[in-house]
Amino acid sequence: MQSIEDIWQETLQIVKKNMSKPSYDTWMKSTTAHSLEGNTFIISAPNNFVRDWLEKSYTQFIANILQEITGRLFDVRFIDGEQEENFEYTVIKPNPALDEDGVEIGKHMLNPRYVFDTFVIGSGNRFAHAASLAVAEAPAKAYNPLFIYGGVGLGKTHLMHAVGHYVQQHKDNAKVMYLSSEKFTNEFISSIRDNKTEEFRTKYRNVDVLLIDDIQFLAGKEGTQEEFFHTFNTLYDEQKQIIISSDRPPKEIPTLEDRLRSRFEWGLITDITPPDLETRIAILRKKAKADGLDIPNEVMLYIANQIDSNIRELEGALIRVVAYSSLVNKDITAGLAAEALKDIIPSSKSQVITISGIQEAVGEYFHVRLEDFKAKKRTKSIAFPRQIAMYLSRELTDASLPKIGDEFGGRDHTTVIHAHEKISQLLKTDQVLKNDLAEIEKNLRKAQNMF
């Protein structure tokens, strides 16, 4: 039995995973569950500005999450937190809506904002977008499975949801299931405990499209990997589409069974890298237009130059600037944006380490010219520092393996993997090398902070 306070806290945990920290802190952190009137879930916001923004931007999103948690369809209403209305909190019994085969219909699991029309295409995600669209148009015929990997907040989940929406819109009665690998694991464990493994298998092996997020969390879970292996085989054999996301390619997921890794590589593997400046500006423009905001170009350029880590933080920064403008009752300018973002920009910028910066730091330490990192020379005095630079590029940046290979003279991504594995092994026993890398990283971060 859950009170609405419990349900709201569970809702906030899901919201937090789908929003940047600045966005969450600005809009959601201070909200509370106020009351339940009939079928209306009432949420209290700290002021009328936040209330209006949430009402315009997040009503459906919150309703979807509430349905996923409770199995009930709620109307969602936001009120100003200053209102002094008191209602008795209601207890809700979860009762998930199932179709005739016992499979959750799945539409409520998809974020309505995550569709292809709202996805901003750039050089870092163009291939992943094209592959996702091809899969949506021809499930199980284009690429199966489709494996998308990349850093946090770069659009992997957006593309997965977009495929789900597209399939449901264009194929009657299509069963689409979206979930994280953590949820798959938790439900599997519960099914064993409650002696309901057959119901669990029916639920996940009778869908047309399975979208599973953050597959890397299956690492080390042998029982869950076994179950997912058979689920994968059943869906694949029945020509059902499987889309998987991860923060790294299959080869780099530790303690993942070889048979699963092999199956993940049957289809197409594509990565998403951080957006370049032009794409970041385009993302901000699209966000501003969608939310009906009039943001000067100089402000968008300023934000795009300061926030270059991922899309969630970029959009969160824009929201923070808008909220700050309203609260202090000042026009939105680049100066106001700098003031609004002063708490998050220093930590963000100080962490920006580039491959070229790593090459400079390693080259200076080992007396290797920058051009030698990209040359074909294999002498130990050059090859070993090059491997160290590749290792650090993998450890300290969000760049993909192909991107790192390109920065080192167009080398294949397998060369990067080999370099990373070699240095990783040496670091376990070689104290001198460990000290060298610590000194290089110290010099690198010092140079970044000076910049």
Swiss-Prot record:
GO terms under cellular component: cytoplasm; plasma membrane
Region annotated Domain I, interacts with DnaA modulators, chain positions? 1-72
Looking at the record, which segments are called Domain III, AAA+ region? 109-325
Task: Give residues annotated as binding ATP.
Answer: 153, 155-157
Alphabetical keyword list? ATP-binding, Cytoplasm, DNA replication, DNA-binding, Lipid-binding, Nucleotide-binding
Q: Which residues form a coiled coil?
A: none
- Provide a GO biological process annotation: DNA replication initiation
Q: Where is this region: Domain II?
A: 72-108
Q: Which GO terms describe its molecular function?
A: ATP binding; ATP hydrolysis activity; DNA replication origin binding; lipid binding
Instruction: Report the locations given in the UniProt record.
Output: Cytoplasm
Region span, Domain IV, binds dsDNA:
326-451
* Protein's job: Plays an essential role in the initiation and regulation of chromosomal replication. ATP-DnaA binds to the origin of replication (oriC) to initiate formation of the DNA replication initiation complex once per cell cycle. Binds the DnaA box (a 9 base pair repeat at the origin) and separates the double-stranded (ds)DNA. Forms a right-handed helical filament on oriC DNA; dsDNA binds to the exterior of the filament while single-stranded (ss)DNA is stabiized in the filament's interior.
HAMAP family per the record? Answer: DnaA_bact
Family indicated by similarity: Belongs to the DnaA family.
What protein is this chain from?
A: Chromosomal replication initiator protein DnaA
Which species is the source of this protein?
Listeria monocytogenes serotype 4b (strain CLIP80459)
